[in-house]
Regions:
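Catalytic glycan-binding domains that act on GlcNAc-containing polysaccharides
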Residues: 3-142
Length: 142
């Protein structure tokens, strides 16, 4: 068994006002964009998934350049971006530009909104039922 991880403050700042458990938001980001840094797995903000392959960049600028190239080469629906690996084709409207998806706070905000939308879709026919956030997270890329 592992001890529960206390999510970093940014996750709480974004998730809690929206009603998303910060642990769920952090778990989604960790699942979607983790890298090994100083012996610990952490979510990495400058992560792209292009046509099913993950790429990690040292800077936001490098990730932005690669993101724009990937969209041009593969199409926006084949590109996921940032901490929550938000799909640019389906969710690009959540950002003012594709590269804005690499802003950690804006990406986590979009990720939280997607989780809320999935929660609402899952529980539309059963209002008042206790929310199973693991089930909601499992619907994240729908």
């Amino acid at each position: 068994a592992q001890a529960a991880v206390d999510p970093p403050p940014a996750y709480k700042q974004i998730a809690l006002p929206k009603g998303v458990p910060a642990e769920v938001l952090y778990s989604v980001a960790l699942t979607e964009s983790k890298v090994l840094l100083r012996g610990e797995y952490v979510p990495w903000p400058w992560t792209l998934n292009v046509a099913g392959k993950s790429y990690y960049y040292a800077t936001r600028t490098a990730a932005c350049t690669a993101l724009l190239a990937a969209i041009n080469l593969y199409g926006a629906k084949s590109v996921d971006s940032g901490l929550g690996q938000v799909n640019i084709g389906w969710n690009g409207h959540r950002f003012s530009s594709p590269c804005e998806s690499l802003d950690p706070y804006k990406n986590l905000d979009a990720t939280s909104d997607i989780l809320i939308e999935q929660r609402d879709a899952l529980y539309a026919s059963a209002p008042g039922r206790p929310v199973d956030w693991i089930q909601v997270a499992g619907r994240y890329h729908r």
